[in-house]
Amino acid sequence: MKLIDLKFKTMGLIAGMCAITLASCSTDDDPVIPEPEPSVLQGSITSDLTLKSGNSYTLNGELLVKEGATLNIEPGVKIVAQYDDRVDYILIEQGAKINAEGTASAPIVMTSSKEEPGAWGGIHICGRAHTNAEGGKGSSEIGGAVYGGDNDADNSGVLKYVRVEYTGYAFDEEHEANGMTFYGVGNGTVVENCEAYHGSDDGFEFFGGSVNVKNMVVVNCSDDSFDWTEGWNGKGENLVAFQESEGTLGYDCDCLIEADNNENNYAATPVSHPVLRNLILVGNGGSKQGIRLRRGTEVEITFAKVCGKAKALAVESAETENALLNGTSKLESVSISGTLDSKEGIYTNELFVGAGNLTEQSFEYASLDDIEKECTWMNGWTK
């Protein structure tokens, strides 16, 4: 196991010395001294590294997992991003992996020494699955790493029972870091039981790819809770977003879901078409949308409750609305507070209700605890 450019405190090594005699000295009984564990993470990983269960590590700057290397993180590990003049984030490049497998009783926590939204830069994973970005390739917003390709079964590792806190670092006026960002990540990657907590950008964002996710929670992220673009077509099951009241947080959060196909080309292929099931999305008022479907995206949503936004469900662009009208996209057993808002007037509130969905509903989700009563899979590891 070798870590290149990884900075850690130097530890002295004490080796036994062999006495010099007329006979040769045997080294059979010399002690084997293990390589010291790094306590500060920084730089580039070029071969496998394991962060041991129960330990705490400091992230000081960028941590880049390079092609061929795997970052293994055991249950109960805590990574604390040092809040200073360095930009802290973890980037998994194409051909690299992260295997972060916590448990409900010992989740992996990635947080900051400054417990405020926007304190550090989150996790960014670049895979070789598709993107409908021009040329079929893209460059990650954070770190500038290449992503995209034609291998939708690409495997970037495992994320289970992982919580990221206080992400959303602003690199400049246009680029803030999400909690977790999936760039062209394939469905060979396992993503389950993950939470984004109190970030100042999106909770989870998908740039293309086919990765499937399950049991995902976003709490109080001031931008969008879930966001997709560039042709994401994975599956999502058990998605929860909760935004505390504006009076409590001091700010109005953005959309619970913001969904695009491609900002520059609404007809770009492969078209965004995730299949989502079992959603509870609770907003904190203001002028933003609950679910915002636009820019050519397609989607299938079954069993969803959406409340707490001025526009619980908004559809925009002819491409997106026509997909709902002709059945390419499906909204089934969706209950919303208020009514559906149609920008183009193609897929209307009447059509939405006629498909068996419910409007003007009232929900009692005053706290995250109220959601946990329905979603017992959240118990024990969410915050």
Q: Model features per residue range: what roles?
A:
Residues 32-71, 82-95, 102, 111-201, ...:
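Extracellular beta-rich repeat passengers
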